[in-house]
């Protein structure tokens, strides 16, 4: 049983994922941005350190799909879910992508032809003013026409590629000058009367094709793609057999440190979820967080096999000028309240400013990797 001390792993495991992995990771990870996503190098270490080939991993807070894709690369079976539609789209794009660049381009050209035929039928009347403010009208019509085709075909990969170029100031993107990670216009830095070229019509077709080619720059060697798609379901609605999961590797939401839906509101709108607020249910106090995690840990204990591992990546939260060790709360719940779990190790990982999306926000500056073992 764990006492009140915090146990640290003697080996400095976090050294394995220090530094940027953008130039070496599978480029599927870069299909579209996702705020606060787990580094692929961390996911790789956790999967290889705590699971074996062909074992089944569960990630019920899948986010950008990092664990899901790295699990398939490592020849593990993956079951994953999330309540955020953008997270589900992004994850399914990564785990069900066309096998080759050639097949992806063939599908893209087919969809672009269909969108071209149907774009005159697209109505702009119900498009909110704030969405219109990001695009040249001709570009927006093309984007809407293509999304209509992709949603009808349920092609997650193509949708994710299009979502990945929705907004930025660079020439390869579709919007007026804007931030890439979080949607806000940069009209003060790039005023229209000075930077007229940046406010002209941007054709969708060549930009989508170029994006797809970038995504296939470093294709992972996948013997088998996931046979299960990521589902949009909350953790308490998961229907899994008792003692069926070898390991859980996930990063649960912690005390409202990030606003995933708000930060992806433009992408959410194009996916058909205009009221993004309902997907950011704030876990903004200790009581709500404890309730969520207690229920989650009960479910995790039920579905894990005996001696199965539950690896939770949890950030340290700052509230009212003090830091809250959320990991300690989770360990106490698992070991003392739920029981049946033993804490094997806790690994501290300091998040450098370059990895944080909001440099001056009250977010996480430190992460804990909590490793729990199911004992009975």
Regions found by a protein language model. Give the residues of each.
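S-adenosyl-L-methionine
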Residues: 1-52
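A short glycine-rich, Lys/Arg-flanked "PGG" loop and its adjoining helix->strand segment in the class I
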Residues: 290-306
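Mobile active-site "lid"/loop adjacent to the S-adenosyl-L-methionine
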Residues: 131, 253-292, 318
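Conserved proline-anchored active-site loop of SAM-dependent methyltransferases
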Residues: 43, 55-74, 78-85, 91, ...
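Acceptor-substrate binding/catalytic loop of class I
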Residues: 29-34, 126-138, 281-291, 312-328
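Class I S-adenosyl-L-methionine
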Residues: 318, 324-327, 331, 338-376
